[in-house]
Structure formats: structure tokens, C-alpha cells
Amino acid sequence: YDIMYGNAGAILSLTGMYELTSDKEYLDAAFRAGELLVEAQKEDGGWQSNPDMCSLAGMSHGAAGMVYALAKLWKYKRDDTILYAIKRGLEFENSLFVQEYANWKDERYYKGEKISESNNYTAAWCHGAPGILLSRIRIQNLMDGEIVDIAVKDIKHSIATVHDSCMGVNNCLCHGNMGNSEIVQEYCKVFPDQEMKAASELTRRNLIEKISQDENLGIKPFYGFQSLGFMNGLAGIGYSIMRELDKELPCIMALDLR
């Protein structure tokens, strides 16, 4: 059901195509995908995309991605069942928020135990505060009332964590510096935070300078091979740098098409 493999990703792509073409078939298909996504919501308010895992927080496989997709659907279909699913999804995800770390628990299993049980807090587009921040930025622009209040509160709680995670050992979009720093820039487009804007611009300049001096562009090889792909590899880094030159290019991490 998630953004990567399921209904949430389909909804965002289909509504994006509708906005580009005005072809109602895309919107009708998005509505059908949304009905299935709402029906699949678990009692805890999350979604179980993998039968071997519990409900997760986060953008790629967790509630942040599902709720963002439903908020995009709400733009075109003001249905109470969609609104209720969004509220429940936010409540579930925020039940995993830990104030001390200004981040959300990563409930995936690694070597037989949950990552969160060892106090490891992922900070990436895929899992953790950066992707959740991007989801909330989009939600506060699509929704109104109580949902916006929740989204803005989450944004304020997590922006510092996201910016502090922009100088790690990997530069990819999915779980690296270019992805996290680009999410901070999306925040700066919406919120008049001049201090964060200046810090973000400096971080991006430093990252691009380091990338230009590294033949691997800061990407660790997988099994001895260079990753050329978009989210995990060179293509995504190149696209993110292109967005510095052309501010009109869409944010692919939010599945924007324009």
C-alpha cells in the first residue's frame, strides 16, 4: 500500500497526471486506489505493507507516505472517510514520536530486533524525520483545520533534526545528504525561516563542492558496483544539483510532476 510499491504511490502519480492532462480517467483511478488504501488501514491507524512487519512510520513504507497520498486525494474528494483515515494515520505516526530525539521510532526489524529498541533513530527520506517532514509540508498545503495544526507542529519539532542530518557519509536522495538537504529547502520555500534558509544554502554549497571533488560522488558501491539509479545513486544526485540551477524543476521525492 505504500509510496514505493503500492496504492499511495499510485494515488500521487495518478493525481499528478490528472493535473498535467485534465484527463478524468487518472482521477477516477486515484479514487479507486484511495478506497483500497482506506480499507487497508489497520486498527492502530497504520498500514502493514509487509506481512512480516508491523505498521511503520516514515515516507517510503510508512504512515507519512499513506497520509500524504490521502491528503492529495482529499484535494479532489472531500470525503469524511478519507479525512478520518488521515487523522488516524497522523495519530498513529505521532505515537512513535520521541521528543528527546525529535524523531520518530524506526520499527523495522534488523537482526531479530526492532531498530528503535537499540535507540537508533533513522534520519532519511525513506525512514525518520526528513521524509515525515516532507510529508507534513505537503499536507499543510493540501488540508485545513486540525490537520494543518498537527502538520505544522510536527514540522516545527523536526526541522532542526533534519538539517543536522545533512552531513553524513552518503549523498544519495533516499538516505543521504542531498535528499535531506533538499527537504530542508522545501521547508524554506514555505516557512519564512531566514536563519534556516541561510544554513541550508551553505550546507548545499559545501555538499556540492565535496561531491565535485569525489569521483564516486559520495556514493558507496553496492557489491562492488556503482549505483546509477535515482533514489540510491548518481542520477538522483545529478538531478538534485540541477534543481540548484533551475528552481522550477519538481521535487521528485514528493512525487511532484511539476
Where are these regions (language model features)?
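Solenoidal tandem-repeat scaffolds enriched in leucines and small polar residues
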Residues: 1-84, 95
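Carbohydrate-binding/catalytic loop surfaces
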Residues: 8-12, 45-65, 102-124, 175-189, ...
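Alpha-solenoid repeat junctions
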Residues: 11, 15-19, 67, 74, ...
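Long, well-ordered core segments of solenoidal/helical folds
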Residues: 29-46, 85-103, 146-168, 198-216, ...
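Acidic, glycine-rich loop-and-beta core segments that form the ion-binding/anion-interacting portion
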Residues: 65-124, 129
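Terminal, non-catalytic domain-edge segments
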Residues: 72, 76, 116, 138-146, ...
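A beta-strand-loop signature enriched in Asp, Gly, Thr, and Trp
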Residues: 105-119, 125-128, 133-183
